[in-house]
Amino acid sequence: MPCSRRQGMFFEPNILQVGSKLCYPDRYSSGHGFYSGSAAHPEVEGANVTGIEEVVIPKKKTWDKVAILQALASTVHRDSTAAPYVFQDDPYLIPTSSVESHSFLLAKKSGENAAKFIINSYPKYFQKDIAEPHIPCLMPEYFEPQIEDVSEAALQERIKLRKVKASVDMFDQLLQAGTTVSLETTNSLLDLLCYYGNQEPSANYNFQQREQSEELEEATEADNEKSKTKAGHHLGVTWRTKNNAERIFALMPEKNAHSYCTMIRGMVKHQAPTQALNLYTVLLNNRLRADVYTFNSLIEATALVVNEKFEEKWNNILDLLKQMVTQNVKPNLQTFNTILKCLRRFYAFGKLPALQTLREMKAIGIEPSLATYHYVIQLFYQHESPSKGSSLIIYDIMNEVMGKRFSPRDPDDDMFFQSAMRVCSSLRDLELAYQVHGLLNTGDNWKLIGSDHRRNFYYSKFFNLLCFMEQIDVTLKWYKDLIPSVFFPHSQTMIDLLQALDVANRLDMVPQIWKDSKEYGHTFRNELKEEILMLMARDQHPPELQVAFADCAADIKSTYESQDARQTAPEWPASSLNYVAVLFLRAGRTQEAWKMLGLFRKHNKIPRAELLNEFLDSAKASSSPAQAIELVKLASAFSLPVCEGLTRRVMAEFTLTQEQREALGELTALTSDSSSDSDSDSDSDISEGK
């Protein structure tokens, strides 16, 4: 059913109406509309008086500093024949495959990190500021403390420089000297310790955090508890009891809400949910209030507690939301996204609470982000191949977001397009995939497609769906538009395209696809080569096409030979040997075809009966009884059942000398003896079994 003509399941007016079971009584107040209407134009007094012209001065508009550049950029479209923009600075480093693309991106990032390290290690050599206006990020950063005496100012400086160990040492020295550290400075120290888990941050800490979150996300999608644990402990940052943060927190003479909230958030971040919930109880006993960010962490901690049923966890989350109302804490987008993110762990039980959460967001006027819809998609489509009727919620989501322009509001916003296209591919819904792709190309939404890995996943799924569902001419247009300017195809992508060409009877494109495959680094992909050879050798084709197929087969044959020379690799597959020999025969390249028979013996592969009959036809066409006898010898060497039939054909269709007839007779006798021996062996095996 087309998406644009359907009514939504959870975006219907009767579901969007304010009446959910969550806990915000102020949602009925005005000013919380989901959409903000455009302001009416002011009426100018006297403007309707005949003969009087009134000038309406528009309100001042502040333009962005790069507004002109943005306007110019909007007039230029992507060049489908060029390499991705990120590689155009250095033509030597333009990749030709997905592996090279990933390697070059890592190399570029490594070079940036090396340059930053040199600049920050030797700042005195990089003092000249050539940028106008001044660009702070291009200048060296000073990471060494300048205040050497033991004072609170020195502690504040070390905290600002994110020196974890030095900050703790300075704090201890101040306590030993009898100096009282202010509550504000102590809270700043707790912030530092809780954020980095009592460990010294590395130079690429933010990059590592992002990698860890992606591993946890993939582990959640795979529902693999072991992989979740491994990803969670990947960096070795876990909350340990009696660490420096807990010690300093216990030494504080006075604590405010900020102190408790920092500790709670640090415990949740570093996998200590039970301790965080216990500390929240202490906060309530001291008649303090938590902020919205702490409640977000507590919601996550509630879902992480083990040995509790899903219903108990959901009730605990509802209790936290009620406490937010009691403490006059207004939820934000991350509150609801955290709830939806946790509900993914509840499987089928989480579907109804997820719908309630979405209704509540609309009721209090919080616009969902792309991450919100990503969590809903993951919850309702947890299986790799959902049935068409399992859930229609993806259609409601697309009805809601079509035509909208999104900006990043959540760290997981860049995962929506990947999950949406995965569902489109699973449902085999091409129209829905076009809608998702249209949303991606709306405004600057393309910036939210994510990393290089996510972009390749998205376009691979999209192109796979095109190959299965779209007409071949349209598919080829997409092929030229997307590859390689947007992404580099995997070997499976090329196989999908070959199968689409087969269905559309466009096998004349196969040699070009092989040429492209070599450019994209798939020269030694055996599955791809066997697919190409099978399509070319399966049926007879016009002579011109057979010549092109034979040239392609010769090129593929050279890859097997060069592969054996360059590395230890599997031998020729029997199917590939058969296909190449057939293609050579059909193109009239008889000499090369007969050489292929020697490869069967060399690699100890058995030729097919159909291939041997085609070879016999070729020998008959060239009136060569010697080749026919060699063919019978090959069949006899492998004790093939077709040997007897080949012998009869040679005796009947060729003019043989007496010597050749005797040789054929000997081959026939040897074949019959070997077959009788095998029959007797099988009979003895049967009798022993009885």
Feature annotation, model-predicted:
Residues M1-K690:
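A basic, Ser/Thr-enriched alpha-helical scaffold prevalent
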